[in-house]
A protein has these predicted regions:
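Bacterial Sec-dependent N-terminal signal peptides
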Residues: 1-9, 13-40
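First exposed extracellular module after export/assembly in secreted or surface-exposed proteins
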Residues: 30-147
Length: 147
């Protein structure tokens, strides 16, 4: 009986500890998201932030969608994807978010197109152009696939 009470107390203590820590992380995460939006989308406001596991899905007032990876302990929040396809204001992903190598490739071979979506992960990058073409790059910016 005594063991059960101790185990229950430890479990409740752990649950309270993790709940309080996640609230702090959420407040810090929201500050990071707001700073990102102020930097790259200065005329927009965050209208929704949805936590999906460790990720945060953010919708801006112009319907731009941004996904952040919240699974990076002790590091700054990183964006995984920026999607301006449904934006009422931005017709392309802000240039400051696009690596130079990718921007150069698009300007050389797809000069009439804009990058409307960009995503990154440990394997590389993926972009979608305004004409619907999707291009995948590896981590060294070599083309892996064009769809």
């Amino acid at each position: 009986m005594k063991k059960s009470i101790i185990i229950a107390a430890l479990f409740i203590g752990f649950a309270l500890y993790t709940t309080s820590c996640s609230k702090e992380a959420t407040a810090q995460t929201q500050i990071s998201i707001n700073n990102f939006v102020a930097t790259y989308f200065p005329n927009e406001e965050v209208i929704a932030t949805i936590r999906d596991g460790f990720d945060y899905d953010v919708t801006l007032s112009d319907y731009t969608q941004i996904e952040f990876d919240g699974n990076i302990v002790g590091k700054k929040l990183e964006w995984d994807e920026v999607n301006c396809k449904h934006s009422t204001v931005y017709t392309a992903v802000p240039a400051a978010l696009i690596p130079t190598e990718i921007a150069d490739h698009v300007s050389r071979l797809h000069s009439e197109q804009r990058i409307v979506k960009i995503a990154k992960d440990f394997r590389g990058w993926e972009i979608e152009l305004s004409n619907g073409i999707e291009i995948e790059f590896d981590s060294k910016f070599r083309i892996r696939e064009i769809d």
